[in-house]
Curated annotation (Swiss-Prot):
The N-terminal domain binds zinc and is important for activity. This is tRNA-uridine aminocarboxypropyltransferase. Keywords: Metal-binding, S-adenosyl-L-methionine, Transferase, tRNA processing, Zinc. InterPro entries: DTW, DTWD2/TAPT. Zn(2+) binds at C31, C34, C41, C43. Monomer in solution. Disulfide bonds: none annotated. It holds the Pfam family DTW. A motif (DXTW) lies at residues 137-140. GO terms for biological process: tRNA modification. GO terms for molecular function: tRNA-uridine aminocarboxypropyltransferase activity; zinc ion binding. The degree of the acp3U modification at U47 is dependent on the presence of the m7G modification at the preceding nucleotide G46. It also depends on medium conditions. Disruption phenotype: Deletion of the gene leads to the loss of the acp3U modification. Mutant has no obvious defect under normal growth conditions. It shows motility defect and genome instability under continuous heat stress.
């Protein structure tokens, strides 16, 4: 199966690593594509979908390495998803060019309460050109840092998603009400943008991932050990 943008970014991160990366469950032997325990691999269930919306994942340092990351699920379902390592001072040239691409309407996905008063904030994708949803993918403190310290994104509007239901995701607990995982927000954005088929496909993929990930945690698969540690 073709590697998606997040897996490619993960491979690049591993290639420049200088020390072992010890995520939770690092002794479990995992599928190197879906990062679930091998016995719970879901790669054969992945079914890509079509959407006019496009996603750009701006990922904090080791985020692509984490089995709990859900940005990878977006790239599984929407193959034209792009992913970049975040940098405050040296952003990827490809990222800068994508943000300036006149074929899209770029916007930063983040809660409205964190935007400055002068920042344009919207709550639904605008009509017209396809939206480019820029998602800041990391822990909540990391996402806040990326939002504050990415001057090359400061001129873009912020789109804020208010999910009325409690988050279904409990792999890594949010630190405050109204904070949701990356894939969950993407599902809502796709639905609001009219990409209902892609929203349904990502929702199904997310549910399968969540179920199998939590099953792997519950089983405490300590006897299924990895042959080698990844580096960071």
């Amino acid at each position: 199966m073709t590697e998606n943008a997040v897996l490619q970014l993960r491979a690049e991160r591993i290639a420049r690593a200088t020390r072992p990366f010890l995520a939770r469950g690092n002794r479990v032997r995992r599928c190197q594509r879906c990062l679930l325990p091998e016995k719970l691999c879901l790669c054969s269930t992945i079914t890509p979908a079509q959407a006019k919306s496009r996603f750009c994942l701006l990922m904090f340092d080791t985020e692509p390495m984490k089995p709990s990351n859900t940005g990878r699920l977006i790239a599984d379902i929407l193959p034209d998803t792009v992913a970049f390592q975040w940098s405050r001072t040296e952003p990827s040239q490809d990222l800068l060019e994508l943000v300036q691409n006149p074929d899209y309407q770029p916007m930063v996905v983040f809660p409205a309460s964190y935007a400055d008063e002068q920042r344009e904030v919207i709550f639904t994708p605008p009509a017209g050109k396809p939206p480019l949803f820029i998602m800041l993918d990391g822990t909540w403190p990391e996402a806040r840092k990326m939002f504050r310290k990415s001057p090359y994104l400061d001129n873009l509007p912020v789109i804020s998603v208010d999910l009325s239901r409690l988050s279904a995701y409990r792999l890594r607990e949010a630190q405050a009400e109204g904070q949701y995982c990356t894939a969950e927000v993407a599902i809502a954005l796709l639905d609001m943008a009219g990409d209902t088929g892609a929203a349904a496909g990502l929702g199904e993929h997310f549910t399968r991932f969540k179920t199998r990930y939590l099953a792997g945690k519950t089983q405490h698969l300590g006897s299924i050990t990895a042959e080698q540690l990844e580096s960071v």
